Amino acid sequence: MYEKHSALQVVGQLLLAAAYLATGIRNTLWKFGQHEERMKALGIPQARTVLVAGFILQLAGAALLALDYQRVVAAWLLGAFTILASLIFHRWWLIPDPLIRHLHISNLLVNLGLLGGLALIAAI
């Protein structure tokens, strides 16, 4: 694990993995129903199945990244998850309230930063 990585690379990779693990566990255990209802309201077919698949993708990718196993595959999995989750949950253009719209734009920008970090991980 982590052969030929600088200490800073290890810290960065572990922080990225921790972000995905923490949100994946939190959302799976305490926010599952809320996310499922939002997806149903958006017309996502088979919302429960899609949500379970998304959480599996998120948690598996984060675990692979934390263990530095198949790092490039993990980065691609998490990248795909991040893009799909952003398209489903951060549809800022549909939100009339300026404050809530701003929060969704901010979350989308954070997700873009995560994608940048994943791209760097894949390039190591």
Regions found by a protein language model. Give the residues of each.
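Extended, low-polarity transmembrane helix blocks
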Residues: M1-Q34, P45-A60, A66-I124
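Flexible, solvent-exposed coil segments and beta strand-coil junctions
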Residues: K40-I44
